Each structure stands twice: as structure tokens, then as C-alpha cells.
Amino acid sequence: MLRRASFVEVDTSSLRHNFHAAKNAIPKDAHIMAVVKANAYGVGALKASEVFLQEGAHYLGVATLDEALELRSCFPKTPILILGYSPNSNAQMLIDNNLTAMIFSLEQAGVFSQAALKSQKHLKVHLKIDTGMHRLGLEPNFKSIEMIKKIRALNGLEVEGIFTHLSNANANIKTHAKNQMKIFNAFLEQLLDQKIEFQYRHAYNSAGILSLCNNNENRFLNLYRPGIMLYGFYPSNEMKQSCQTILNNVVSLKAKIVQIKRVKKGEFVGYGKHFYTNEETLIGTLALGYADGLVRDLGNRIQVAINNQLAPLIGKVCMDQCFVKLDGIEAKEGDEVILFGDKSTKANDANEIAMLLNTIPYETISTLSKRLERVYV
């Protein structure tokens, strides 16, 4: 039974479909690291991970220690890589929970090594290489090769993998992504010349998987990191238009009408006088607000779906509630409202909401609050 009159509905069959879309795009002998950071982009990390592991995911990828620990409590043996930076103070937690850390410095490798030796355990690490995003990672040069040799020589560490991240693979012109892969491949070849090999080599995110798997750029890769595509969205609108792969909608934001009232002409609805009743108006209140992830500025800007009818969202969205105009709409208290979801319901999807807000669907769905229950269908 729902504890609130608002929730996120998650289509698990679509999660499975999208996972296999990723699986079918990569080489048959390669593995998938399902990226489930940010609560699986708002879908719910535990359930999404369960689905992906059932369908054959080999690894899980997160951004933070807390995300990794949440998963470890339910999946005691699954490999979990923390893709983001792990402070030195997290070393013992990483070791005790058999997590895999990303590193890019000899200094941190030394700290992790000492902690592992003290615990009489070992810590798996993946080396991050910066091939052109200029965010985190070692530069792909001779100095880094010498550093990698020193890191590999440290006791207590298992240098399991090496990876980079593509910054612009969702563009129509793939020059930058291909240059990044050219740099990464050249660096891997230099390492091979020094007899330095890694169990896992990865670079492709959703954009790389959807657009760069038919070339030679991925010849060294054996692990792939789908993220946004697992949740039903293409990395860009340009890719949506050109991509042959079909992705299915996963996420719907829903709420129930908790009260309907008739407001007389000449009144303001909600905070700040942002909706004025030019005539007697039927108003429905929903128990859903910006603290749940429904952006405040969507008031007076979108229509929502109620019983296969479209009704305007009016006024400014409040922290915990919002309003719909119900004149001419067949609706009653307790009826379900779709704020965004599958296009077949007549509602906007999260990508359309993102475009309206000049952002991306990653943000629209990953900011859905944990105080919203996830309902899996």
C-alpha cells in the first residue's frame, strides 16, 4: 500500500528490454557494467541492479561509497566499481566491503595499499585515464606508464582494470570521441609493449555503445558501461533521430488528486499570484512538489494526463503539492495523474520535460526524490 499519493512507476520489462539493447550492441564476448549511480538515475538502485544482474550484468557502477554500500548489502558477491573519487578516509570501508575503487595517483594508491596490508586483505582498483574530457585521470604519457608500474608493484592492491570516459560521443560528428579512443588505444598499446595488461578495459558509455561499436575503436575493450540508455533515453536528441536501436520508456511520475475544489472568479491559486482565475475554476490538488523532483518552474508550462485527457498544471509548484485545472476534464478525487511518462498515455516524456527546462533527461529523472516510492510493474 502506498504511503503517499504520489510515486514513481518503473516498468521492469522495459529495463530488461533496454539492457538487452545494450547487450546486443556490444561484442558477444564482452561484459556489461550496468551504471546504477544516482539511485539508478532515479529508478531505484536495488531493484534496477537486481533486474540487470538477472539479465547478465557482470559489474555494477556507482559514483559514491554510500551508493556502493547500499548495493553491497543486497548483492554480497557482485563486483561494484565506484567510478567517482574515493577519499583516502574511505580506504577501510572499501576494503572491508570488497568494493573496487577508481584511482589516478600514486599517492592514493600508496594509502590504499597500506590500509589493505594492515587488514591483511587486498583492494581492487581501476586506473582512470584522461583522454580529453579533462576531469579526472592520469595523462596518457610515459610518466604515467612509470607511475602505473609503481602502482602495480604495491602489495595489497589488485590493479584489475583501466578505463577512460568519452565526453562527446553523443554528437553527430564523432571526431572528438574517435580521437579520445585513438589516444586510449595508443596508450594501451604502449602498456602492452611494457607487458602491462589489465583484466578489464572500458571506455564506452551509452553514446559509445549506440554509435561506435561498428568501428575498430573498441578493439581493446571488453567491458561496457551503459547508463542512460538502460532507463529508456538516448544520450542526445540527435542520437534519438539517427539511432537504429529502440529503447523503451521506463519511468513515469504519477500522483493522485487528493482534493478537488471550485474556486470563484478573481482569486489567486498557490504561492506568489502566478495563476489568476478569470472565471470560476475547478482546481485539483496533487500531493507532489519540487522537493519530490517536479521542477517549480513547470507550473503554467505543461499539460498532464488524467484519464487519457490533458489538463494544465497551474500556478507555481509548491514544495510538496501542485495544482491542475480540471474544467472540462472528467476526473474525481483519487484519480491518477501522469506528470511525465510513456508517450502512449498522452503525457510528456521526461525528455520533453528536459527540453522545456533547457536541460537533459538525465537530470529530470535522477533528481526524483527518494521520498517518492518506486512502484515496479
Swiss-Prot record:
InterPro entries: Ala_racemase, Ala_racemase/Decarboxylase_C, Ala_racemase_C, Ala_racemase_N, PLP-binding_barrel. Substrate binds at residues 135, 319. Pathway: Amino-acid biosynthesis; D-alanine biosynthesis; D-alanine from L-alanine: step 1/1. GO terms for molecular function: alanine racemase activity; pyridoxal phosphate binding. Gene3D superfamilies: Alanine racemase (3.20.20.10), Lyase, Ornithine Decarboxylase, Chain A, domain 1 (2.40.37.10). The modification N6-(pyridoxal phosphate)lysine is found at residue 37. Pfam families: Ala_racemase_C, Ala_racemase_N. It catalyses: L-alanine = D-alanine. SUPFAM superfamilies: Alanine racemase C-terminal domain-like, PLP-binding barrel. Catalyzes the interconversion of L-alanine and D-alanine. May also act on other amino acids. Belongs to the alanine racemase family. This is Alanine racemase. The lineage of its organism: Bacteria, Pseudomonadati, Campylobacterota, Epsilonproteobacteria, Campylobacterales. The gene is alr.
